[in-house]
Regions:
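Short, charged alpha-helical interaction segments and adjacent helix-coil junctions
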Residues: 2-51, 120-125, 233-332
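Extended serine/threonine-enriched, polar tracts that run as long, contiguous segments within proteins
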Residues: 196-229
Length: 332
């Protein structure tokens, strides 16, 4: 399987060619030698096409989907997801916007303003957070507040709440939380608020949750049935055989892969991107383990509290029974 993608993308180099370049340049050699053997193999597999590139990792995603350079790509993906024509007006800064440590498991995060003024946040979590709805709601509210402050500052006395536009939160999961696996036939879950009477009140916040691991399984079993599924497979699947299936079914994706593998010819750049991803992965995994352990501790506390309450209730019941027994004894 090592050279399958080289048949599709002849610019891919051999393993020896990549190793020769690394050995010839001290900076590359120094970085390479800090990696574990498994990491070295993974890097070489990417550069040679033995496996595909993970498109969702921030560096590759932004190289391919950069809205300032190729806005039509992200526009098409968003249009298919939102089921409406989308045109990106500009990219918004999101530095420092993430609440608390919410960036700990993100591998990609971008905020764009659409032509109609609405805001779309597109993010991917490597491992899905616990409480995905609650977390998404908090960050969506933060984006809504940022928009309010920005628009109010621009409009001044002419400001109207009608000037505030929708905020879309589009969340991809590389490894989705367990609750999504209760719905194995669905790879998109759309949520928006509505009233119980049917009266239409615009509450501005909409959410899309996209478990890519489930999308991969569906497309592997049922085939790539439409353009949206083609985009999801492009994002989700780095297996050479699935990349071949995608390019055969939708030849327009060949150009995108060619751009990715052109990046891979720049060993220093890819090595820097790869090192950054490894650093983030290590930090993210530690944070995830801390979060999981804290959740377990919290759950145990609740169980202990419940046991304490049950013991207290039993003590009260025993005391009541002893009191009844004493009363009965007095009657004898």
């Amino acid at each position: 399987m090592a050279n399958t993608l080289q048949l599709y993308f002849p610019m891919l180099r051999t393993r020896q060619q990549v190793l020769d370049e690394i050995e010839a340049k001290e900076k590359l050699r120094t970085t390479y030698n800090t990696w574990e053997e498994e990491e070295k193999k993974y890097f070489l597999d990417i550069c040679t096409g033995a496996r595909g590139v993970k498109m969702l990792y921030d560096g590759f995603f932004k190289a391919i989907f950069d809205p300032d350079v190729k806005p039509e790509r992200l526009e098409e993906l968003l249009s298919l997801l939102l089921n409406q024509k989308v045109k990106i007006l500009k990219v918004l800064p999101n530095d420092g916007a993430r609440i608390a440590d919410e960036s700990s498991l993100l591998i990609m995060d971008i905020v764009v303003q659409l032509e109609d003024g609405s805001i779309a946040n597109v993010e991917c979590q490597k491992i899905g957070y616990a409480f995905p709805g609650e977390r998404a709601a908090c960050y969506s509210s933060d984006l809504l507040l940022r928009q309010y402050k920005r628009v109010r500052g621009l409009k001044g006395k002419k400001f109207s709440y009608k000037d505030i536009k929708k905020v879309y939160s589009i969340i991809f999961y590389e490894k989705s939380p367990s609750l999504f696996h209760d719905f194995p036939e669905h790879y998109i879950h759309q949520s928006k608020q509505q009233t119980d009477t049917g009266i239409e009140i615009e509450l501005l916040q909409e959410f899309l949750f996209i478990p890519l691991d489930i999308a991969k399984t569906i497309c592997e079993n049922k085939g790539i049935r439409n353009k949206l599924e083609a985009w999801l497979m492009f994002l989700a699947d780095d297996r050479p055989e699935m990349i071949q299936r995608l390019v055969d079914a939708y030849p327009e994706f060949r150009l995108l892969y060619e751009e990715v593998y052109a990046i891979c010819l720049n060993t220093e750049r890819v090595m820097e991107m790869f090192s950054k991803e490894l650093l983030e992965l290590d930090r993210n995994t530690v944070q995830y383990m801390i979060d999981e352990m804290q959740d377990e501790i919290d759950a145990q506390k609740v169980q202990l509290q419940e046991k304490d309450i049950m013991l207290q209730e039993k003590d009260l019941e025993n005391a009541r029974l002893r009191e009844e027994i004493e009363k009965l004894k007095k009657k004898i």
